[in-house]
Amino acid sequence: GLTDDEIIRGIAAYQPVGSRARVVRTARYTVIDDCYNANPDSTAAALRSMATLPAGRRVAVLGNMGELGANAAALHRETGVCAAKAGVSLVITCGELARQIAAGAAAENPAVATASFDTLDALLPALPGLLQPGDCVLVKASHSMQFERIVQALTQA
């Protein structure tokens, strides 16, 4: 077996696999790369986790969540409410359903700023103008949204 010290060192050295709750600190931002997949529960958990990180402004870049059936719009809206309750200052969305996330956040707390984009190609060039140095940025959506492109842009900025 392992000693207690070996177990502690192993836990301390843990790095998530792929784009699953991976925290990347750059000169400009703290990026939470959780873009491998998304559903309402995992997104709510990611938003709550972001609230525990020491950082400046909290920004959530959120996209469509797939396979939610007839309740998809309502579940996206509830995710926006969760973002507002988690202390997110800015909600940036991409995709038609994700607009409901922005609507839910603004309805819960009108002080939450929102920006919504139809496509990733529209969002990417606008992103630098929306973010500020020191921001903590959560990036989360269903894998089909290709949000790894956002993570790449943020971590190479």
For the regions a language model picked out, list residue spans one by one.
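ATP-dependent carboxylate-amine ligase
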Residues: 1-157
